[in-house]
Design a protein with these regions (language model features):
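Short, Lys/Arg-rich, polar N-terminal cytosolic tail immediately upstream
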Residues: 1-27
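A structural signal for multi-pass alpha-helical bundles of membrane permease subunits
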Residues: 29-325
């Protein structure tokens, strides 16, 4: 049946009216969303945006902790400057680059181990067994303990004279003499990684467990009926399905690891062999009272983290919503 011109015009008018109502509803929802989110944005600007802007500004000055109101604008001299043919500044400081390497190494190793262990723990906790709820609560205890408390606790456990770790290894005959875990350059950073893995693996397990619980159960029933090996089910079914959530968890955890401060500072203080970028910035700002140089280090930390976030999101092709492109 062929529609008349009047009917076509009426149909088009109805579609336009419907689209207009949807557009008006969308605009209303957007306005409501902005109204609700505006207070949060204002608070974020006050507690995060303003300090960040001040830090970036101070990085271009010669401000010191003794005279925060008496400083001069010096441009990029805190970052890189040439005086009588000699290059000076943050980018020429070997301690800065050592702290960058320590931070990147710590992040890569700790996040990798935590992701693997967190996945294993999440798979175990996702299974059905008696006392599963209690076990889930127990697993979260290390993550719930404040970082400083965890670091002090492990500092005593790793003590070369009174620590339980050395005592146990000596009794088992694994070592012949006590090891200075946090003072030895060969073991200090590994000790920090070990403590961080103990504390943060439950966090990764929690995020991965949440992703596992959202998976449909019928695919596993089908795999069980077909007699597919559980290992193959994990790599062919489970891992691809939780990949977006896993990538988001890795990004969030890497962000946290890149700004590590308290764990390293409590365990090893200002040791050059374990100094992170945040510890270096604190040393310049507090110990040396160089606000300009400390602010420059903090600004570079911000830029490095921001760059790595962009790279990770592009490489993993993951949106913050957890959907892959």
């Amino acid at each position: 049946m062929i529609m008349s011109g009047a009917a076509l015009r009426a149909s088009a008018s109805a579609r336009e009216a419907s689209q207009g109502r949807r557009s008006s509803l969308t605009r209303s929802r957007v306005r409501s969303a902005w109204i609700f989110i505006a207070p949060t944005l204002v608070v974020l600007l006050l507690i995060a945006g303003w300090p960040l802007a001040r830090t970036i500004w101070f990085s271009f000055t010669d401000a010191s902790l003794n005279s925060l109101n008496d400083y001069e604008f010096i441009g990029f001299e805190n970052y890189l400057a040439n005086y009588d043919g000699e290059w000076l500044g943050l980018l020429t400081d070997p301690d800065w680059w050592r702290s960058v390497w320590n931070t990147v190494w710590f992040t890569a190793v700790s996040v990798s181990i935590e992701t693997v262990l967190g996945t294993i723990v999440a798979l175990i906790l996702n299974a059905s067994f008696p006392g599963r709820g209690i076990m889930r609560a127990i697993v979260l205890i290390p993550w719930a303990i404040p970082t400083v408390v965890s670091a002090r606790m492990w500092n005593w456990m790793l003590h070369d004279q009174f620590g339980v770790i050395n005592d146990l290894l000596l009794r088992l005959g694994i070592i012949a003499a006590p090891i200075t875990w946090t003072a030895n350059p060969d073991t200090a950073l590994w000790a920090v990684v070990m403590v961080d893995v103990w504390k943060t693996t439950p966090f990764m397990a929690l995020l991965i467990l949440a992703a596992l619980q959202m998976l449909p159960g019928d695919i596993y029933e089908a795999a069980k009926v077909d007699g597919v090996h559980p290992v193959k089910v994990f790599f062919r079914v489970t891992l691809p399905l939780i990949r977006p959530a896993l990538l988001v968890a890795v990004i969030f955890r890497a962000l946290d690891a890149l700004r590590v401060f308290d764990l390293i500072y409590v365990l090893t203080s200002n040791s050059r062999d374990t100094m992170s970028m945040s510890v270096y910035a604190r040393q310049q700002l507090v110990d040396f009272q160089e606000v300009g140089l400390g602010s420059a280090a903090s600004t570079l930390i911000f830029l490095i983290i921001a760059l790595l976030v962009v790279v990770a999101m592009v490489a993993g092709q993951v949106r913050l919503s957890g959907e892959t492109r």
